[in-house]
Amino acid sequence: MRRLSSWRKMATAEKQKHDGRVKIGHYILGDTLGVGTFGKVKVGKHELTGHKVAVKILNRQKIRSLDVVGKIRREIQNLKLFRHPHIIKLYQVISTPSDIFMVMEYVSGGELFDYICKNGRLDEKESRRLFQQILSGVDYCHRHMVVHRDLKPENVLLDAHMNAKIADFGLSNMMSDGEFLRTSCGSPNYAAPEVISGRLYAGPEVDIWSSGVILYALLCGTLPFDDDHVPTLFKKICDGIFYTPQYLNPSVISLLKHMLQVDPMKRATIKDIREHEWFKQDLPKYLFPEDPSYSSTMIDDEALKEVCEKFECSEEEVLSCLYNRNHQDPLAVAYHLIIDNRRIMNEAKDFYLATSPPDSFLDDHHLTRPHPERVPFLVAETPRARHTLDELNPQKSKHQGVRKAKWHLGIRSQSRPNDIMAEVCRAIKQLDYEWKVVNPYYLRVRRKNPVTSTYSKMSLQLYQVDSRTYLLDFRSIDDEITEAKSGTATPQRSGSVSNYRSCQRSDSDAEAQGKSSEVSLTSSVTSLDSSPVDLTPRPGSHTIEFFEMCANLIKILAQ
């Protein structure tokens, strides 16, 4: 597999120390803003222009383990070309032997998810304004053949003027379909019926469904589909029946029903939404311009002069980089940073709120609260058991007595890794599941359906979260070919737990792996008996069966 360093210059990429702080390229890294699928996101400051950026750090080892090297290269190349006022911009990519640094636009307002948690539902006018911005960004990327597939309030950021910015657009497209639930923090509430049922889908229609769920959350402060019991939640989503509060405008209800149409062929398109009477009210012209060009080809003399002063270079050098479209050159990056920051300020004055956002929106608590790892289940507020997004705030839940989740796609434990796997093996044996051992901390499990005689399959992988905590991750398996090609272990039925104990490692070995925030625990392969691998193709969706397997296993482990 070709190394990513082969497509990025290394000369300016080496990490340096700047007054005791880490410096990468021209950026001085600061505090951690959050932790994503591939690594951390830190705030950065351009050492010459002084502008803030968000630096997403992609760990090469994790990229290789997820087998997304080629996809990351293609997606980054595309995202670098995107320029839209409501999509987080990618300014530059810097590569080192250990990490890839994506220098992106910085916004200070936090997540839409957190804002709704703190303030509750928005009024209709404000909900429409934000939804118009979100849909404009979705439309822009769809026209460039990029689909998000994981739209949710956590992926919509807010700037200081309460404008929406879609994050991770295109990065989630690198994930395989089978990994959707695992990469969505165990919450399928925003997923379209065709996604959770395992049917094929083109892509844009799933973003429409998720956008409809976001619109509902903006207007109601709740989720249209929610339930403590996963199979029941899936049934609600597949039925497409949701509660509409009386305070909702009949016009927006018709739009929601069109967007949350179960049949993707009958679901609203972006064209349908744009032509809807509710959506067209107070629609700024810049969101859907006749000429879809969002960037000017004219050279900004003031920005050009500022770059020359900061870098002590000639105008010819800067112009050469711009005309040659050398987007990786520091001069070009600095120029576009200056242009974009000025444009953002002007757009805020021209199109958005003239007053400052409320203090409650920009307080320190809101900006620094860590990203929620999973969505907790909430106390029902009416006989309809509506779950408010406001109650999703873990800080509030401490005071409101909100009960913890009954399910998620993983189990956390502070027991020793070998003890965890021993208990897992006992539970699998008690349930009479079949399994094979890939390594002492990675199992592939299957259960035979007594009615259809087909198999439901899942994998169990133990991860180290920190020096004391481990996560047992559940994942559905639909690819028998990959499973057969692994060849590292053979299936076993009701095997002995002693096989795991023979793979024990010392506590010092376990502590040595605590250096990474989340590393897979690996060891030598354990070979059991040689039962044949079943390669019989399985029909359709096994999502429900997968969650039933998870529920049964969790029930036994909880005893």
From Swiss-Prot:
EC number: 2.7.11.1, 2.7.11.31, 2.7.11.26
Protein name in UniProt: 5'-AMP-activated protein kinase catalytic subunit alpha-1
Entry's free-text remark on domains: The AIS (autoinhibitory sequence) region shows some sequence similarity with the ubiquitin-associated domains and represses kinase activity.
Pfam families: AdenylateSensor (PF16579), AMPK_alpha_AID (PF21147), Pkinase (PF00069)
Modification comment: Ubiquitinated. Phosphorylated at Thr-183 by STK11/LKB1 in complex with STE20-related adapter-alpha (STRADA) pseudo kinase and CAB39. Also phosphorylated at Thr-183 by CAMKK2; triggered by a rise in intracellular calcium ions, without detectable changes in the AMP/ATP ratio. CAMKK1 can also phosphorylate Thr-183, but at a much lower level. Dephosphorylated by protein phosphatase 2A and 2C (PP2A and PP2C). Phosphorylated by ULK1 and ULK2; leading to negatively regulate AMPK activity and suggesting the existence of a regulatory feedback loop between ULK1, ULK2 and AMPK. Dephosphorylated by PPM1A and PPM1B.
GO cellular component terms listed in the entry, alphabetical order: apical plasma membrane; axon; chromatin; ciliary basal body; cilium; cytoplasm; cytosol; dendrite
Family: Belongs to the protein kinase superfamily. CAMK Ser/Thr protein kinase family. SNF1 subfamily.
Active site, per annotation: 150 (proton acceptor)
Location of region: AIS: 302-381
Phosphoserine modified-residue sites: 356, 360, 397, 467, 486, 496, 508, 524, 527
Gene that this polypeptide is encoded by: PRKAA1
Biased composition (Low complexity): 516-535
This protein's UniProt keywords: ATP-binding, Autophagy, Biological rhythms, Cholesterol biosynthesis, Cholesterol metabolism, Chromatin regulator, Cytoplasm, Fatty acid biosynthesis, Fatty acid metabolism, Glycoprotein, Host-virus interaction, Kinase, Lipid biosynthesis, Lipid metabolism, Magnesium, Metal-binding, Nucleotide-binding, Nucleus, Phosphoprotein, Serine/threonine-protein kinase, Steroid biosynthesis, Steroid metabolism, Sterol biosynthesis, Sterol metabolism, Transcription, Transcription regulation, Transferase, Ubl conjugation, Wnt signaling pathway
Keyword Chloroplast annotated: no
Cofactors (names): Mg(2+)
Polar residues: bias regions: 485-505
Protein activity control: Activated by phosphorylation on Thr-183. Binding of AMP to non-catalytic gamma subunit (PRKAG1, PRKAG2 or PRKAG3) results in allosteric activation, inducing phosphorylation on Thr-183. AMP-binding to gamma subunit also sustains activity by preventing dephosphorylation of Thr-183. ADP also stimulates Thr-183 phosphorylation, without stimulating already phosphorylated AMPK. ATP promotes dephosphorylation of Thr-183, rendering the enzyme inactive. Under physiological conditions AMPK mainly exists in its inactive form in complex with ATP, which is much more abundant than AMP.
Gene Ontology molecular functions: [hydroxymethylglutaryl-CoA reductase (NADPH)] kinase activity; AMP-activated protein kinase activity; ATP binding; cAMP-dependent protein kinase activity; chromatin binding; histone H2BS36 kinase activity; metal ion binding; protein kinase activity
Keyword Magnesium: yes
Residue span of region Disordered: 485-536
